[in-house]
Amino acid sequence: MTPESVHVYIVNRNRVSCTKRLVEWLLASGTERITIIDNDSTYPPLLEWYQSLNGGVAVHQTGENIGPWRAWDLASSMEVEPFVFTDSDVVPPPECPGDLIGKCLSVLADAPGCDKVGPGLRLDNIPTQNLTQEYFQGQSLHAWESQFWMRRRE
């Protein structure tokens, strides 16, 4: 299995700009198999963009909002090989290496018994002060994500 052949599943509902950026990043990184699991989106610009997709990007319409956990079950039921599962708003920053999937595969190979690996979210740009309603969950998000930064791997 090559990093390019790893199937990437993106769960999405009504998000167009970040989903576009993520798909563009994946394609630029050489990813060959991308499936967007759409949770019953209704946003016209997103639906129009879906219609324009081709070349290694498929959209699986669920017909209802099944949420992230059932979307995970759907993706894992279709795969026996390692795969990527991500939210549509997790867009790698410019400093993220293009061979991210390959690095994750290496970590999996070096860690018997490990069945999930992934990059950590940057924590230095998550507001922890509840300055606006938009960042109301900042504290709990920071606390949750901190657990994944116990040991850094390059």
Regions found by a protein language model. Give the residues of each.
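Short beta-strand-to-loop acidic/aromatic patch adjacent to the donor-nucleotide binding site
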Residues: 80-93
